[in-house]
A protein has these predicted regions:
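Short, hydrophobic beta-strand elements of compact beta-sandwich sensory domains
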Residues: 45, 147-175
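Extreme N-terminal signal-anchor transmembrane helix of membrane signaling/transducer proteins, especially
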Residues: 1-29, 186-190, 194
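Core beta-strand residues in small-molecule sensory/regulatory alpha/beta domains
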Residues: 96, 124, 154-156
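Membrane-proximal alpha-helical signal-transduction linkers
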Residues: 40, 44-50, 206-220
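Membrane-interface helix-start motif
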Residues: 169-188
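Alpha-helical transmembrane segments of multipass membrane proteins
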Residues: 197-198
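Extracytoplasmic/periplasmic sensor domains and loops in membrane signaling proteins
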Residues: 76-90, 105-141
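Short N-terminal helix-loop-first-beta-strand/juxtamembrane motif that initiates sensory/input modules
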Residues: 40, 44-56, 80-103, 132-133
Length: 220
């Protein structure tokens, strides 16, 4: 191996390794952190939504006409509340009574609210049966994929679960933000790698040339 190649391997090799490690870090740690941030944002909005309903005194109950009430507050007519939350957070919210959607800010392609459809079996098992909070990266709202967070709703201070609150945000939009950040950092790392490789190449060439000159001088 020539002197120039040896010098290049010593200067450029660590740069390439560092760049690859940085890219791996971005694909794992950065993405994981962003997913945690999305989950926490959804969880916070779900808790705020639940608190907005729970502040009304009285039990959750179903009236003879099918409307769901919390004391004297008609949840089935709480359009202004869910729409205000959506406008303030950019997230859609849904109130489930049992496994049935009875109020939501989410609308279909015709602009109608997505109501009365049931939750999926896994969600029912996790939230309604086991009483767990549940985050999913694949919740479909009228064919549009969402990140979603589900939180059980209890009958006042009892252990009886009467339904759940859901908060979702468009998955494609969030992924675009995450991927954009990763691409930006990746591009910066690549530019830094190229610059360092250029400096290393120039340095290796200069050192190699000087060594050759020294050898020639010694031979003379």
């Amino acid at each position: 191996m020539s002197i120039q190649k040896k010098i290049l391997s010593m200067t450029i090799g660590p740069v390439v390794l560092l760049g690859l490690l940085s890219i791996f870090f971005m694909l794992t740690t950065v993405r994981s952190s962003m997913m945690e941030e999305i989950e926490e944002g959804l969880k916070g909005t779900a808790a705020a939504t639940l608190a907005a309903y729970d502040q009304n005194t009285g039990d959750y109950m179903e009236s003879s006409n099918g409307d769901i009430w919390k004391g004297s507050y008609n949840i089935s007519r709480s359009e202004s509340l869910v729409d205000r939350i959506r406008d303030n957070t950019g997230m859609d919210v849904t109130f489930f009574y049992g496994d049935r959607r009875i109020m939501t800010s989410a609308v279909d392609s015709n602009g109608d609210r997505i109501l009365n459809s049931p939750a999926g079996d896994r969600i029912v098992e996790k939230v309604l049966q086991n009483g767990e909070e549940y985050f999913s990266s694949a919740v479909s709202l009228d064919g549009v994929m969402n990140y979603g967070y589900f939180m059980p709703v209890y009958q006042n201070d009892s252990t009886e679960i009467i339904g759940m609150v859901f908060v979702g945000t468009n998955k494609e939009d969030k992924d675009a933000v995450v991927n954009g950040m990763i691409f930006g950092i990746g591009a910066a790392v690549c530019v830094a790698m190229i610059l360092c490789m250029g400096v290393g190449l120039k340095l290796a060439t200069s050192i190699s040339r000087n060594i050759k000159k020294s050898r020639n001088w010694l031979r003379c």
